[in-house]
Amino acid sequence: MTLCIAANIAAVRARIAHAAEQAGRDAGEITLVGISKTHPAASVRAAFDAGLRDFGENRVQEASAKIDELRAANVLPRWHLVGHLQRNKVAAAVDRFDILHSIDSIRVAEAINERAAIPVRVLIEVNIGGEASKLGVAPEEASALAANIAKMRQLELIGLMTVAPRVDDPEDVRPVFRRLRELRDAIGLRELSMGMTDDFEVAVSEGSTLVRVGRAIFGDRAIEAR
């Protein structure tokens, strides 16, 4: 397992580097986040041993036991929460995650501000595609939420995140990534969390700084935790 995961990480990094070169970008400004949701702590350990330092999880409850197990083993990567954050999970989230990608309401932001002992890095999730099945604020609401978050002492707003629609051709989501970049630039933020296993090269070419790759590193996900 360890050798397979290490080889997968190397292959993904090579693809990121190629996409960055084609776009005239420095690959060093792009962080690879390994999405380890539904995969065991042993898989995270294997990826960590292969040099990966950033990992993403979707569910606070599922991730908490995994993070605590790895902490006990002195495996201390940066943890990214990329799934929806409910207010009743805020305390557990701020105690375990370094970066929260999915802030989509003032109420959740306020709850984080009240609970966090030290400033927490956050991104606003934007539903660029306007899909009813997706979470995130509408693009026209992002600036107002950003302005409100900027007033909160315990939140450091660093960027925007989106989950692109599922399509057969990755090029079809280029306008989604481009629009998020334009919105990020208009608000004046640094990070862009966009791009997953099937479309991260297009995301890199459109300015992504945080690519969230799961299947290409860890293989097909395990059975979803209920």
Residue ranges and their predicted role:
Residues 208-226:
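Gly/Pro- and small hydrophobic-enriched strand-loop and loop-to-helix capping segments
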Residues 1-198, 204-206, 218-221:
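Conserved alpha/beta-domain cores
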